[in-house]
Structure formats: C-alpha cells, structure tokens
C-alpha cells in the first residue's frame, strides 16, 4: 500500500523524469533484454538491437502507461484495466517479467537522476512499481 508520502515521492520523481520518460523506458527494456535474455521471447518480431525504433516505441508505451498510473495513483486498477487485460489474456506475459522490468526501471532511473533518487524515493518507486505489477497481473487469476 502506498502511503501519502510514497505517493508524493512518486509524483515528484515522475515530474523530475518528465520528458525523458520514454527514453528511460526504452533503456530499461534494453537493460532487461540484456540482463534477462528469456524476456526477449515475448518480442520475436522486434529488432532488439541497441537503439532500435521498435524498442524506443515500446519504451514510450511503457513510460506512457506508468505516467497514466502516476496520474491515477489512487485508482490504478481502473486506469490500467485494459492494459491488464491485454497482458493477461492476449499477450500472456509471465508475471515475473513485470518484476524484472521494474528492477531495470529502478536501475535506469537511479543512473539518470541520482540527486532525486534518495533512499525514500527509491523505496517509494519500488512500492509503486510493485503496485503497478500487481494490477497488471490481477486478471491472471
């Protein structure tokens, strides 16, 4: 459960990330593919080379979904319902992959925003990504 302080930390961090969210999303995907090669199996039709247009496009989709979650932090299940349906019923993504991407997002954000990435912000973002992952996997049951 995100506390009021967590919600404020997440909103502040996301504001600092700002227009770079799509780039960071793409970098986190690349990081995930390199660190956890089995995750590539969900993207057989993608050019997975560094800087590919497909990774950039999907990274922006990830960032846009997270921005939507931040903007609806008090109703993430409602805001992410269609995305949850897509990942559970059509794409059938293994739920563990959300945790892997969350970790890669944390590493990417910490590397680009060290001043903003305090221990409290790190903890809040970790909880936020876990909450997003829970929502995205809620329709698997």
UniProtKB/Swiss-Prot annotation:
Record key words, sorted: Heme, Iron, Metal-binding, Oxygen transport, Transport
Keyword Metal-binding attached: yes
GO cellular component, one term: haptoglobin-hemoglobin complex
GO molecular function: haptoglobin binding; heme binding; iron ion binding; organic acid binding; oxygen binding; oxygen carrier activity; peroxidase activity
Tissue expression pattern: Red blood cells.
Binding of O2, residues: 58
GO process annotations (BP): hydrogen peroxide catabolic process
InterPro entries (alphabetical): Globin (IPR000971), Globin-like_sf (IPR009050), Globin/Proto (IPR012292), Hemoglobin_a-typ (IPR002338), Hemoglobin_oxygen_transport (IPR050056), Hemoglobin_pi (IPR002339)
Record flagged with keyword Phosphoprotein: no
Name of a matching Pfam family: Globin
UniProt binding sites for heme b: 87
Domain Globin, chain residue ranges per copy: 1-141
Function description: Involved in oxygen transport from the lung to the various peripheral tissues.
Stated family: Belongs to the globin family.
Assembly: Heterotetramer of two alpha chains and two beta chains.
Name of the protein this chain belongs to: Hemoglobin subunit alpha-2
Lineage of the species this protein comes from: Eukaryota, Metazoa, Chordata, Craniata, Vertebrata
């Amino acid at each position: 459960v995100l506390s009021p302080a967590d919600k404020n930390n997440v909103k502040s961090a996301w504001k600092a990330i700002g227009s770079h969210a799509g780039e960071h999303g793409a970098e986190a995907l690349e990081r995930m593919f390199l660190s956890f090669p089995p995750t590539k199996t969900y993207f057989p039709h993608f050019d997975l080379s560094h800087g590919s247009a497909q990774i950039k496009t999907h990274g922006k989709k990830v960032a846009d979904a997270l921005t939507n979650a931040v903007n609806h932090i008090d109703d993430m299940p409602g805001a992410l319902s269609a995305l949850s349906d897509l990942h559970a019923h059509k794409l059938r993504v293994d739920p563990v992959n959300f945790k892997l991407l969350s970790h890669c997002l944390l590493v990417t954000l910490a590397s680009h925003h060290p001043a903003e990435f305090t221990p409290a912000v790190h903890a809040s973002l970790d909880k936020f990504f876990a909450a997003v992952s829970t929502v995205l996997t809620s329709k698997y049951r």
